[in-house]
């Protein structure tokens, strides 16, 4: 390990170590599969896969005679067909068999038949948090989506409340503020008046509805109150006699008051619009929205005054008709259907999260019910009305209390739920069979729905992604990514600005910096460094507890809901050894407001300044001196850095480098403390101290030169020697882009910030030849080429070195089996695997039959279908894999064998390669200059790199200058530094180090021109900067073509490197050539070089023969136009100057010649 000097304003020690950075993946999958509990034979918790089986079983037959009951499941871990390494090599999936013990119970006879039923295979997660599917490593990205529960919001003039379940129908309430009516919508169907909906749910009288929402007051009816009563609403109906009935909810008139007095009504109950009851402490509704709805009912059903209540039939007809238009209605069925929509566990599930959110909102303690209750509906309506009246506030839908994370375990649980419901349906159908008593448990279960659902999820789901494996940081970030897209999430086109924006609840939970730059900005984000996901799926971040103004070492994880209204101090707030704050006023934040307060008011304190950003951003030194846009680019570009042959860790680091290397899974860590007894390039053996058994050894296999998903090189190198003692958890072998157990994505270069003859104009980069000669930025890239050997209708294809019409020179590189030899250097067009396919014989002529009879089988025709090296690729063959049916057991239908050839290429730094620093300072290498021509320092040291000073001011990424200054001091003092983010070294500290190293405190030095030896006019800033080579290499982008494939209809060359296409000559290029008057060049470009088919052939003949040429035919695009016009019914013919018809096609030519 490298000894680093802590240089910054904060404390070197942290109160809380960083968690395992991929625990979000590992913990979620362990919760789903509970492998540890299965191994140790412990009882399983009712979550993940276990909860799916418990919810589906028992499955009972229609008549209740037969029941299929679930006992337990187990994973056949010992019966794994292939190891992880073999799966990658053979293109297989790393998975285990899932078996479920089922009991088929015959309730009439009491007989029980038990069987362990095969339930398909289930992919297993590797220690690195990835899955291996069809030989490729994949990551299931966590999805951030809208949390189930209740949410209150406003759109235009509509105040709305929405109850979102985990599974089931959405229930929406909305108040039309213009008309003062409250409606309900189920699954966004036609809206229903709220009072009708309540009546359908059992609030069948006006009195019940009023007493549910309003406070009620009793008033004596006497002469003194006579004037106050008109205009008020009755809360209870009054029945004086048959023709004198006063309904609850009706407005009292003066005449009504007179009737009360005359008929001896002494006391009446009225609606009290004062929304607070002082005795019970309850809040009630204070607007007349519900009363308006009762009034609207009368108009809706055209009720005459004096009618007592709405008939139940009318209510059910109205509600059911809105929900299921056009369906026949029976009242009992309608009532049952309505109840099952919300109150049946099979149709509706709020989920643990939904129930938790509703309970938090309405102060309801029972967390056991997962269906909706009347209490929930009434509370939602009351709360919405109170918001409408201005007594409560709306919810913020972008608050992290309203968004939650679905990790891999939960996503898979949902997949299994859907598949098992189909299995249940099939089992019930099979149970209805008359022969049910002869059945066995396995005959009732159909595995197909499960197998296809799991396969589809891992292979095609938007959330199961091909792992970004360019370097260890890219891997780690991919596993910590949060995606708002995908099934049940947002879509790119409909996501607005608000949902993409940074929110104050993201602090310590989601990184405000790291996100893509394109259309996915803000929709794909990263977890913050200390963040974790709690049991409900909400993101939590740790804080230190502050008690009576004193900081304690007690830690507490808070979700965004818990953190609301809490007073939180920053991590760098100064306090003494007893935890007392040194300042009388401390900077704090309270729900997104930043202010200062007395230490006594503080509840919590941040654990670390890097708490709010992601791992990638925390690797950028002096981050706080950079503009946010450039920090975003810096975070993203570190993930694109290619692993180099000889990388070095940065002189100026942040302290995160070793953590990233350790948790990324690319390095080898010692499992137990012990002594190294064997260390070779491919294997390390450690004898543990704790074990007495001489055979109990820890073996570690070292990966050498393997291809990653992105064609970069995965290579591990041993760090220990035989006889060395190692501690548990110590890094004993480096991986790609790591050095001495630290992340090392690039190299430290001596920098001069100076323009040089225009070669670093517009972000271009000038590089010294020394960098290329010393292989500082040389990387290895490995490409895989594969070919299938198939069984065809005409016979099997053959892998052979006996290929027709191929020169001996090319065949010399193949071995006796027709496969390229390992170690051969191959170029475009070389054969990697010789393969011949039988040709169809067609109609054999007598002459050919004679030849066959003379020469035997040899004359039988075969087609050359060999695997060749594509254009633009060359390199050394490092491995050949042959995968047969015997190896794998299940190749695709018709495939006999698969051959894979791996070609490695060493790529040095070239002009056109993209390079970048860690601060978003990117550019393309414009010139590689000989060392002697580079500007040099007074002691003769030539610079490694020259960057343009104009790249700094407008980009506002000053961090690169500070890094360069400190890097310069570090290089000459032989020190490496830890400069944590938001606690960086000050200018004074940097200047002190520069002085100590013997440099000017400004780090400006006199530079000398390498051409003339003369000093430059002004002093130039010199430093040491950490630069990366990015995965945008000129070799992959450079492309040229002579002849190649043409489009079928237009006969013009295809476009793009992948299609081996040509360059497009557009109309603007035509104008340019017209302006020059280059008529012949233009004609050639538009005809023979494009789509003049006959002209192409003739000009090729002429070039081969060496004859001067001036061919011009008719371009195919003209023929296409002609055919289009003929399609419109216009018969067009073309004639030359002599009146002779010009043929456009071969057929026309024949017709003209005949005519």
Curated annotation (Swiss-Prot):
It is an enzyme of class 2 (transferase). Pfam families: RNA_pol_Rpb2_1, RNA_pol_Rpb2_2, RNA_pol_Rpb2_3, RNA_pol_Rpb2_45, RNA_pol_Rpb2_6, RNA_pol_Rpb2_7. GO terms for cellular component: DNA-directed RNA polymerase complex. GO terms for biological process: DNA-templated transcription. Its EC number is 2.7.7.6. GO terms for molecular function: DNA binding; DNA-directed RNA polymerase activity; ribonucleoside binding. DNA-dependent RNA polymerase catalyzes the transcription of DNA into RNA using the four ribonucleoside triphosphates as substrates. The RNAP catalytic core consists of 2 alpha, 1 beta, 1 beta' and 1 omega subunit. When a sigma factor is associated with the core the holoenzyme is formed, which can initiate transcription. PANTHER family: DNA-DIRECTED RNA POLYMERASE I SUBUNIT 2. This is DNA-directed RNA polymerase subunit beta. The gene is rpoB.
């Amino acid at each position: 390990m490298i000894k680093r000097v802590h240089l910054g304003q904060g404390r070197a020690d942290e109160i809380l170590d960083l968690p395992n950075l991929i625990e979000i993946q590992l913990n979620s999958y362990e919760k789903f599969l509970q492998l540890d509990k299965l191994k140790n034979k412990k009882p399983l918790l009712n979550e993940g896969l276990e909860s799916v089986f418990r919810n589906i079983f028992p499955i009972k037959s229609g008549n209740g005679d037969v029941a299929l009951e679930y006992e337990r499941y187990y994973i056949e871990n010992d019966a794994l067909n292939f190891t992880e390494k073999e799966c990658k090599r053979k293109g297989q999936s790393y998975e285990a068999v899932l078996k479920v013990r089922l009991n088929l119970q015959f309730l009439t006879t009491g007989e029980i038949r038990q069987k362990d039923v095969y339930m398909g295979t289930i992919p297993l997660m590797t220690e690195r948090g990835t899955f291996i599917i069809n030989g490729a490593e994949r990551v299931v990205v966590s999805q951030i989506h809208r949390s189930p529960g209740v949410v209150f919001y406003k759109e235009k003039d509509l105040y709305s409340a929405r109850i979102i379940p985990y599974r089931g129908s959405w229930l929406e309430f909305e108040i039309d503020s213009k008309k003062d009516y409250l409606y309900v919508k189920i699954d966004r169907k036609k809206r229903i008046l709220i009072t009708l909906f309540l009546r359908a749910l059992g609030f069948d009288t006006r009195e019940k509805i009023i007493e549910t929402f309003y406070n009620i007051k009793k008033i004596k009816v006497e002469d003194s109150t006579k004037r106050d009563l008109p205009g008020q609403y009755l809360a209870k109906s009054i029945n004086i006699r048959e023709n004198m009935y006063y309904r609850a909810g009706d407005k009292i008139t003066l005449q009504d008051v007179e009737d009360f007095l005359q008929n001896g009504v002494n006391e009446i109950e009225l609606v009290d619009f004062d929304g607070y009851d002082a005795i019970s402490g309850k809040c009630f509704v204070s607007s007349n929205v519900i009363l308006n709805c009762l009034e609207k009912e009368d108009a809706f059903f055209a009720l005459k005054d004096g009618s007592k209540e709405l008939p139940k039939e009318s209510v059910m007809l109205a509600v059911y008709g809105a929900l299921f238009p056009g369906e026949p209605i029976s009242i009992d069925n309608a009532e049952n259907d309505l109840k099952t929509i919300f109150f049946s566990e099979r149709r509706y599930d709020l989920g643990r999260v939904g129930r938790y959110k509703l309970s938090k909102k309405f102060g309801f303690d029972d967390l056991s019910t997962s269906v909706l209750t009347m209490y929930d509906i009434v509370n939602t309506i009351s709360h919405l009305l109170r918001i409408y009246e201005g007594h409560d506030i709306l919810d913020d839908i972008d608050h992290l209390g309203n968004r939650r994370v679905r990790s891999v375990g939960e996503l898979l649980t949902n997949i299994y739920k859907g598949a098992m419901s189909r299995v249940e349906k099939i089992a019930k159908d099979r149970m209805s069979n008359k022969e049910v008593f002869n059945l066995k448990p396995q005959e009732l279960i159909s595995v197909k729905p499960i197998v296809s659902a799991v396969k589809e999820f891992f292979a095609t789901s938007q959330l199961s992604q091909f792992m970004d494996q360019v370097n260890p940081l890219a891997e780690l970030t991919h596993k910590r990514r949060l995606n708002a897209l995908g099934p049940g999430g947002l879509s790119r086109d409909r996501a607005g600005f608000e949902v993409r924006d940074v929110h104050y609840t993201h602090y310590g939970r989601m990184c405000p910096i790291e996100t893509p730059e394109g259309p996915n900005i803000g929709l794909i984000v990263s977890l913050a460094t200390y963040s974790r996901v709690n049991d409900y799926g909400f993101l939590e971040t740790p804080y230190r507890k502050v008690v009576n103004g004193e900081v304690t070492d007690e830690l507490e994880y808070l979700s965004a809901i818990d953190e609301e209204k809490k007073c939180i101090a920053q991590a760098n707030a100064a306090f003494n050894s007893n935890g007392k704050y040194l300042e009388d006023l401390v900077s704090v934040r309270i729900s997104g407001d930043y202010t200062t307060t007395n230490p006594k008011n503080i509840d919590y304190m941040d654990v670390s300044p890097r708490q709010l950003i992601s791992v990638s951003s925390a690797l950028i030194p002096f981050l706080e001196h950079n503009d946010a846009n450039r920090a975003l680019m810096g975070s993203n570009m570190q993930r694109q850095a290619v692993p180099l042959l000889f990388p070095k860790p940065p002189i100026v680091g942040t302290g995160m480098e070793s953590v990233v290397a350790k948790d990324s899974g690319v390095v080898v860590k010692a499992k137990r403390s012990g002594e190294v007894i064997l260390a070779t390039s491919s294997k390390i053996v450690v004898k543990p101290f704790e074990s007495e058994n001489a055979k109990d050894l820890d073996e570690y296999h070292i990966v050498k030169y393997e291809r990653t998903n992105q064609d970069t090189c995965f290579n591990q190198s041993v760090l220990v020697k035989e006889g060395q003692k190692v501690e548990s958890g110590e890094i004993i072998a480096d991986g790609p882009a790591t050095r001495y157990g630290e992340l090392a994505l690039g190299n430290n270069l001596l920098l001069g910030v100076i323009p040089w003859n225009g070669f670093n104009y517009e972000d271009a980069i000038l590089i010294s030849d020394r960098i290329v000669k010393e292989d500082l930025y040389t990387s290895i890239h490995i490409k895989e080429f594969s070919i299938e050997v198939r069984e065809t209708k005409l016979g099997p294809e053959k892998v052979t070195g006996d290929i027709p019409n191929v020169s001996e020179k090319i065949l010399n590189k193949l071995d006796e089996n027709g496969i390229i030899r390992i170690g051969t250097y191959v170029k475009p067009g070389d054969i990697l695997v010789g393969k011949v396919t039988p040709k169809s014989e067609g109609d054999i002529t007598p002459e050919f039959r004679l030849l066959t009879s003379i020469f035997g089988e040899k004359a039988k025709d075969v087609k050359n279908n060999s695997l060749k090296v594509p254009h633009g690729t060359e390199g050394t063959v490092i491995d050949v894999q042959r995968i047969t049916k015997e190896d794998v057991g299940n190749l695709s239908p018709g495939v006999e064998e698969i051959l894979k050839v791996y070609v490695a290429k060493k790529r040095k730094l070239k002009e056109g390669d993209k390079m970048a620093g860690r601060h978003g300072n990117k550019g393309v290498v414009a010139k590689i200059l000989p060392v002697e021509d580079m500007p040099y320092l007074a002691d003769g040291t030539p610079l490694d790199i020259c960057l343009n000073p104009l790249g700094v001011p407008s980009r506002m990424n000053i961090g690169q200058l500070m890094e360069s200054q400190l890097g310069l001091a570090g290089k000459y003092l032989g020190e490496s530094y830890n400069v944590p983010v938001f606690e960086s070294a000050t200018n004074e500290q940097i200047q002190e180090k520069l002085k100590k190293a013997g440099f000017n405190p400004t780090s400006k030095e006199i530079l000398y021109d390498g051409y003339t030896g003369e000093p430059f006019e002004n002093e130039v800033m010199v430093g040491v900067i950490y630069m990366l080579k990015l995965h945008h290499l000129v070799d992959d982008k450079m492309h040229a073509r002579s002849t190649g494939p043409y489009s079928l209809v237009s006969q013009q060359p295809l476009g793009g490197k992948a299609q081996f296409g040509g360059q497009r000559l557009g109309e603007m290029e035509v104008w340019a050539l017209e302006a020059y008057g280059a008529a012949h060049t233009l004609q050639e470009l538009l005809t023979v070089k494009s789509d003049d088919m006959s002209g192409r052939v003739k000009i090729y003949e002429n070039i081969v023969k060496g004859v001067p040429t001036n061919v011009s035919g008719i371009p195919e695009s003209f023929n296409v136009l002609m055919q289009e016009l003929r399609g419109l019914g216009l018969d067009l013919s073309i004639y030359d100057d002599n009146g002779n018809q010009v043929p456009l096609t071969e057929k026309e030519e024949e017709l003209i010649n005949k005519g």
